[in-house]
């Protein structure tokens, strides 16, 4: 109990937490709010650091390694944010949202660009995510004007989404990491990707779909990047996740 209320000392100025205390007196709701606020504050700090490093003309690789170590922060949201800010990407499609770490960072980048839209597709969330607030619960209301979230299977929803958009600047795969789904999403999104745009994927070492895609489209790719993720508690120590992103040739 002491730990909970010592944490409250840092947020009692926040009208939202005061409202929760008055209305519910629910310790779990208070702890959840504090946890979400802490995560959001960290992501804003990370975003600010990335912007500073971009202003110093640091490369994406330098930014990712420095920021992930400094803040003990997962790399893939750093990459997505950095690409959007560096290349001023506008139309983004992602498959897989979960809590919303990537979505928060992407939407913050679009807000700072003062334009653009994120189209996210995710199937029904896990029980843990549901308990915390549902798919994308880390995304605050003020960022949602840049966001179109659809709940469902990417195998059914990705094609109509892309057909409606007609083109995009960035595609991010982080849904089902089976060979079939990864290969399907990569090949479909590539058809709609603008020249100089990016095809990105988390967990590329779950199958050979990413390597196969590169082999099939190497004449259309200008840059290939592979980055090893930081070690996370849920990871197999012998199979650390790998992140990949490709830049399409400028036509």
Question: What name fits each language-model region?
Answer:
Residues 1-52, 249-251:
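Membrane-proximal basic amphipathic "stem/tether" segments
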Residues 22-35, 49-61, 133-140, 159-166:
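Short charge-dense sequence patches
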Residues 37-74, 85-86:
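Class I SAM-dependent transferase core
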Residues 66-71, 77-251:
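S-adenosylmethionine/decaboxylated-SAM
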């Amino acid at each position: 109990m002491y730990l909970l209320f010592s944490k409250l000392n840092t947020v009692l100025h926040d009208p939202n937490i005061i409202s929760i205390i008055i209305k519910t007196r629910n310790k779990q709701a208070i702890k959840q709010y504090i946890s979400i606020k802490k995560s959001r504050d960290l992501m804003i700090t990370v975003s600010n650091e990335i912007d500073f490093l971009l202003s110093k003309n640091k490369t994406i690789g330098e930014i990712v390694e420095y920021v992930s170590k400094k803040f003990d922060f997962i790399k893939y949201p750093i990459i997505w944010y950095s690409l959007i800010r560096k290349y001023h990407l506008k139309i983004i499609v992602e498959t897989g949202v979960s809590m919303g770490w990537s979505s928060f960072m992407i939407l913050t980048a679009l807000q700072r660009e003062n334009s653009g839209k994120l189209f996210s597709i995710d199937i029904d969330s896990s029980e843990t995510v549901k308990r915390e607030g549902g798919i994308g619960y880390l995304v605050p209301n003020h960022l949602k004007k840049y966001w179109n979230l659809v709940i469902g299977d990417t195998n059914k929803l990705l094609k109509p989404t892309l057909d409606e958009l007609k083109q995009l600047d960035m595609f991010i795969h982080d849904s089902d990491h089976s060979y079939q789904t990864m290969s399907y999403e990569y090949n479909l999104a590539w058809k709609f990707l603008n020249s100089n745009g990016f095809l990105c994927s988390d967990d590329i070492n779950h199958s050979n779909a990413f390597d196969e895609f590169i082999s099939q489209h190497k004449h259309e790719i200008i840059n290939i990047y592979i980055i090893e993720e930081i070690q996370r508690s849920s990871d197999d120590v012998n199979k650390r996740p790998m992140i990949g992103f490709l830049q399409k040739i400028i036509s």
